[in-house]
Every structure is written in structure tokens, then in C-alpha cells.
Amino acid sequence: MFRWGIIFLVIALIAAALGFGGLAGTAAGAAKIVFVVGIILFLVSLFTGRRRP
């Protein structure tokens, strides 16, 4: 999940340097979505992680 987030982040940073538009804007939107989903999954796993039986 974080690998995809990093890939989309790099694409989004390149898109930001060149101006958001078309496919670049879509990649930036996808990077935001993947980042938020990754953070939510991290927080869920943090609170429901390994507990002693």
C-alpha cells in the first residue's frame, strides 16, 4: 500500500512541477486517496494490532 503511495507521490510531485492537468491531475488525486487509505489502515492496525491472549 505504501509502495503505491510513494509511486503516486512521485508522479504527483512531477505533475506539480509541470502544472496539474489531465493525467497529472488524476495521478495527484490518486496519490491523495492512496495516502489517506494507507493512514487509515495504519491507524486501524495500530489499535487492533497484536494483543496478548
UniProtKB/Swiss-Prot annotation:
Q: Which domain of life is it from?
A: Bacteria
Record key words, sorted: Cell membrane, Membrane, Transmembrane, Transmembrane helix
Q: Does GTP-binding count among this protein's keywords?
A: no
Q: Write down the InterPro entries for this protein, in alphabetical order.
A: DUF1328
Regarding the membrane, this protein is recorded as: Multi-pass membrane protein
Q: What is its main location?
A: membrane
- Which parts pass through the membrane? 4-24, 27-47
Write out the annotated subcellular location. Answer: Cell membrane
Q: Which Pfam families match?
A: DUF1328
One GO cellular component from the entry? plasma membrane
Q: Which family does it belong to?
A: Belongs to the UPF0391 family.
Question: What NCBIfam families has UniProt attached to this entry?
Answer: PRK13682.1-4, PRK13682.1-5
The name on file for this protein is: UPF0391 membrane protein KPN_04833
